[in-house]
């Protein structure tokens, strides 16, 4: 199955974690980087295009600056990222050069992907670079980003990049063999799970949540990334990044790591952007009847189904849609501001103009701008 699945894939996103790129002292491991670049060069010779999402800038900068511990303040993280990113790019440039490949640095923030125009510009840039045979190396722009607009980690970023790049496969390279039934570092009975078809709450619980002293993402963030990629119809494979020839091994269809297969029902690219690239500005709490209609019938959200609104936002903002239990089940672009929704909650659509003195339409969120998660 794996051989047939991977044979058809022409564009791959490869995400490399900090623990893969660095040695035990936290310095860049040029031997590992060289081997990975050699593997990627082999994919290029097969006619496949590769987009690299690389962690390691802060770790590399920390080593260059002589920091003995992971930086904790934002200025220290950004200083480490500033010096580390140049070191990372130099390492990739030197490692790809013997294979006749050039690299390009692409630094993104969440705001870049939240704007539909900038999102499409990023897609066009990646298409152009790949057309020239260049390897784009993507990282979050840690030097300028603030906590409120961070992607969170590069696992999340790599899942979003699969949509930007219109890729057919996401490869996440980490420091363990793949996804286990429990944490193998603390549970000797943990077993490797070779295939996951549908990410359930049990799978998410088994993933845990802790990261490392070098990177920011644990297995939980990798499973979350696989879930987002699956919603885009893209399979994800988590593999041991330091193993020699690992990319060639997995692309040959051999059973290595953990393969997450996409869901049967996936989102179109615009709705995937809406669900995962935008940062929600508030919450709309709806009654059980509205929740049922949105989940099972794919209808628009009417004011009559709204119980209350939380947060302050303007018309056109992305908002979470939650049931009466306050659990999020959908996201969408609101046709009305939070103050307007507060006045319209529980009312019939026919009364919108009487209440506000104007109307933008009959719905709070149109079904075309609503995504069930």
From Swiss-Prot:
Biological processes annotated in GO: L-proline biosynthetic process
Keywords: Amino-acid biosynthesis, ATP-binding, Cytoplasm, Kinase, Nucleotide-binding, Proline biosynthesis, Transferase
Localization per Swiss-Prot or TrEMBL: Cytoplasm
PUA domain segment(s): 281-359
Binding site for ATP: 15, 174-175, 216-222
Reactions the enzyme catalyzes: L-glutamate + ATP = L-glutamyl 5-phosphate + ADP
Principal place of residence: cytoplasm
Cytoplasm is among the record's keywords: yes
Pathway: Amino-acid biosynthesis; L-proline biosynthesis; L-glutamate 5-semialdehyde from L-glutamate: step 1/2
Gene Ontology molecular function: any one: ATP binding
EC annotation from Swiss-Prot or TrEMBL: 2.7.2.11
Keyword Nucleotide-binding assigned: yes
Binding site for substrate: 55, 142, 154
SMART domains attached to this UniProt entry: PUA
One GO cellular component term: cytosol
Family: Belongs to the glutamate 5-kinase family.
Function noted in UniProt: Catalyzes the transfer of a phosphate group to glutamate to form L-glutamate 5-phosphate.
HAMAP family in the cross-refs: ProB
Protein name according to UniProt: Glutamate 5-kinase
Organism: Pelobacter propionicus (strain DSM 2379 / NBRC 103807 / OttBd1)
The gene coding this protein: proB
């Amino acid at each position: 199955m794996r051989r047939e699945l991977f044979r058809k894939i022409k564009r791959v996103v490869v995400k490399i974690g900090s623990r893969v790129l660095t040695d035990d002292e936290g310095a860049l491991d040029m031997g590992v980087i060289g081997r990975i670049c050699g593997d990627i060069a082999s994919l290029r010779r097969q006619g496949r295009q590769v987009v690299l999402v690389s962690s390691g800038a802060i770790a590399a900068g920390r080593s260059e600056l002589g920091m003995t511990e992971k930086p904790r303040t934002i200025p220290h993280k950004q200083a480490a990222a500033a010096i580390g990113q140049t070191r990372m790019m130099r390492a990739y440039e030197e490692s790809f050069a013997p294979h006749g490949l050039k690299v390009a640095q692409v630094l993104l923030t969440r705001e870049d992907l939240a704007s539909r125009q900038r999102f499409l510009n990023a897609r066009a840039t990646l298409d152009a670079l790949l057309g020239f045979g260049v390897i784009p190396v993507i990282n979050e722009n840690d030097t300028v980003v603030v906590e409120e607009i961070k992607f969170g980690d590069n696992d999340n970023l790599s899942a979003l990049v699969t949509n930007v790049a219109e890729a057919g496969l996401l490869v996440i390279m980490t420091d363990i063999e793949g996804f286990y039934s429990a944490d193998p570092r603390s549970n000797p009975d943990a077993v490797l799970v070779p295939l996951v078809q549908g990410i359930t709450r049990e799978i998410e619980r088994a993933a845990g949540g802790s990261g490392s002293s070098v990177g920011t993402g644990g297995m939980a963030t990798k499973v979350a990334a696989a879930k987002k990629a699956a919603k885009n119809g893209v399979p994800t494979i988590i593999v041991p990044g330091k193993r020699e020839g690992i990319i060639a091994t997995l692309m040959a269809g051999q059973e290595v790591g953990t393969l997450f297969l996409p869901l049967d029902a996936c989102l179109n690219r615009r709705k995937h952007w809406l669900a995962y690239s935008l940062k929600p500005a508030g919450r709309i709490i709806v009654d059980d009847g509205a929740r049922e209609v949105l989940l099972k019938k794919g209808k628009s959200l009417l004011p009559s189904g709204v119980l209350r609104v939380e947060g302050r936002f303007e018309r056109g903002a992305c908002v979470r849609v939650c049931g009466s239990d306050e659990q999020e089940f959908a996201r969408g672009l609101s046709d009305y501001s939070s103050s307007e929704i507060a006045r319209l909650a529980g009312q019939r659509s026919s009364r919108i103009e009487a209440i506000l003195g104007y109307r933008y339409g009959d719905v709070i969120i149109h079904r075309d701008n609503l995504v069930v998660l």
